[in-house]
Amino acid sequence: MGRYALDMEKYADLARTASAEGCVLLKNDNSTLPLKKGDKVAVFGRMAFHYYKSGLGSGGLVNTRYVVGIFDALRACKDIALDEELIGIYEKWIKDHPYDEGEGWGLVPWSQEEMPVTEEMLQTASGDDVALVILGRTAGEDQDNTDKPGSYKLTRTEEDLIRKVSSQFSRTAVILNVGNIIDMKWVREFDPAAVLYAWQGGQEGGNGVCDVLMGRVNPCGKLTDTIAEDISDYPSTSNFGDLQKNYYKEDIYVGYRYFETFAKDKVLYPFGFGLSYTSFSVQASAEEKDEHTVCVKATVKNTGTKPGKEVLEVYAKAPQGVLDTPVRVLCGFAKTKELAAGEEEHITLEIPKNTFASYDDSGVTGHRDCFVLLEGTYTIYVGTDVRTAQKAGSYPQTFTVLEQLEEVCAPQKPFARMTRKLGDVIGYSDTPERIYGPYDRVEKPAEISQTGDKGYRLEDVYDKKISMETFVAQLSDEDLIMLFRGEGMCSPKVTPGTAAAFAGLTPSLRKFRIPAECASDGPSGIRMDCGTKAFSLPNGTLLGCTFNCELVRQLYEMTGLELRLNRVDTLLGPGLNIHRNPLNGRNFEYISEDPFLTGKMGAAQLQGLNIAGSTGTIKHFAANNQETKRHEADSIISVRALREIYLKGFEIAVKEGPARSVMTTYGPVNGVWTAGSYDLNTIVLRKDWGFSGIVMTDWWAKANHEGQPSDPRIHAVMAAAQNDVYMVTADAQDMQQDDMLEEFQKGNLTRGQLQRNAINILQFVLKSPAMLYEMDRISPEELKDRKNAAKDDPDVSKMMKFVADEQGNIRISGGGWDTHQGKEILADLDMKAGSYELQMKVKSNLDDLAQLPVTVYLDNIIKGTLSFRGSKGQWVTQQIRFDTFEGHHYMKLYFGATGLTVDHIAFQLSGGADKEQ
């Protein structure tokens, strides 16, 4: 196997291991788990038959070669026997209650209709040894959860299922195939013997869960979120989901920082909690090593009878003084190797004090906008979850300023934020008045004198024959503006079906041998809407629950190699936003309520991706903590909460990954849309953190001038803020699509700013695989390995291609199409922006009782299902409507039953549409 060959067996093994290590066991009475050899197992729940491998949206649209669900893996296990009669009852019911795929993007059901459990089913399973109840939930991009049955809460049918099965079986295990945590009050009410969070484990998820259920892997996952009694117990809930403004009044008291400080009695399962099939003891000590570091030494011993892994968690408690602090802050963790019964492992962690420093945004310590260590006693706690961690040591600390920074992204007006008063009582105080407006500190770099084309090519910079500045001096003003614009989605200039192309997209830029760079959606795998297969990874929450950075790094090393083989330069992930509230639909894509864990896991993913030369784009920078009205809803946050909570994970990933690419959000923070925030994109990223990569917008992002609404044409403020690449346009050469040229001519956007951004982009290009292809410096070994990869993928070069006429219409003949059940028709469509009506003319010789569905996908997103019936040989036409953006799209027609003859399909443009559709 060559150096660049993708070892799919190793890839699958790593994903399977991660899926297993991310499972979190919350309860295990009566030794219900692991399953015993010879057990007869009753599987309940219709979601056993449809596994959620991922959440919804851009992060979930990976075409996979296979998906192993929990039921699939159980059925393949030879050590147990499934109750086939019960399975038959479910399969018969599901035929009459098929899976509901919803109506497309943002309109997919959070859950599926559950089969009511009957006395017949219970009687059928009465002789079985153990019952597994499998429940599922999904949510995702543009689709938050709601505090309703079928979403955050169980439905009555699901409650009835758990109640009846738990009453009949002393060994009942409920398995949750979910992306986010859900309401868990039912555990106490119905008392199932075991409860396991299995999350969404990608294409190997079922195998990983089965390994845990069978005891091949001892559960060792830990919760990355606090599970509280009720959704109303989370302090963010009262300020979540507003369509205009969300006040982060809980401030730094997010997740366990709030509950351990103010509301211990509201916690059902604490942060960091997770059971094992064995038991462990922890002996630890902590002391100050020097003025910068605390040293923790611990011995973890397996005191049980089964081999297993344990997670060591370290928390700091700062002194309470003029600056209030939470009673616990995670500042270190480590996962043991697999320890045999009686075996122990000695762990030493050297923890920088800046991991638990506090930020003073008001000057109450005398040092405004500084990270500080407070005067007093710092106490270190060590254990296996935040609640049971024991004191390991303490030390006296003198007041110390660790880092002088400056105010960024401050609220326009003060608002009341939560504080901790003496006696751990909740108080409120106003955020400080801001000093700087969003444009007060915008720097205008000196311009490089333009020389025109001197014959230099980007390869000359790569070979160090000339400086980057000499190269950029050749670029015209139009070149610099066009370099700012990415194209997509599904640009034909890069790997088919991917999210975007950027850099060398126009003839004038290509003249300088600037390659087109490729970006693909992630972070759950490579999304290629043309049908090319890729590996579907476990979701972000599951990976966080492993607490195993080395395992995650190894897994993403495989993904990095997969990116390189597919000529993708950056994966749009990992997602590093904070689980501020359990109802955020995109929590599955993010990691935790804790910024330290988030940053460490994000850095591990980047370290793996970077090895093969491609990289990741960390997102969404910053504070993308709800999907409802994410383009408009203003996140109003104190500078302290930004610095300690919502930016900290990004900071760790930028510095330790290191990150080379960052994506901003759709919406505003404190009145300024992040795509055009100089504070975020220049001061925080580049000045404070030393970031030297590129920043890109989210797709079709908007910006604003402070105090004004956002506008999709406002791009110049993005470039001035050092957001280097606007994503995405249909044509980078179109100078009328935005305000770039106009603002440049007015002097509001300078040549020096554009040249600075160009240098950022081109420095990224120089480190990318695309540059090696451009210079023809790819090794024969890599070319061979790439040629041998993925032979079963569709040949995009032979795909039908159609271009809209002047009116925007496309007509495709269906003559000769194979429309047997399960067959697909793929086509590459070059469409205009607007509202389309798709008309499909078919006939069937079957009678009118025949059901002949055809599902229509555009760029892997379902647009609708045409529900034909038998027409006794008569031609019939049905239609669906949808909006789309200008550019290339990949259409797929999926035939759900045999019996149709297609005359043609036609796409008719009927009106303009918003680009965000």
Can you describe what each PLM-predicted range is?
Residues 1-388, 409-844, 853-917:
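Glycoside hydrolase catalytic-domain context in secreted enzymes
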Residues 389-414:
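Short beta-strand elements
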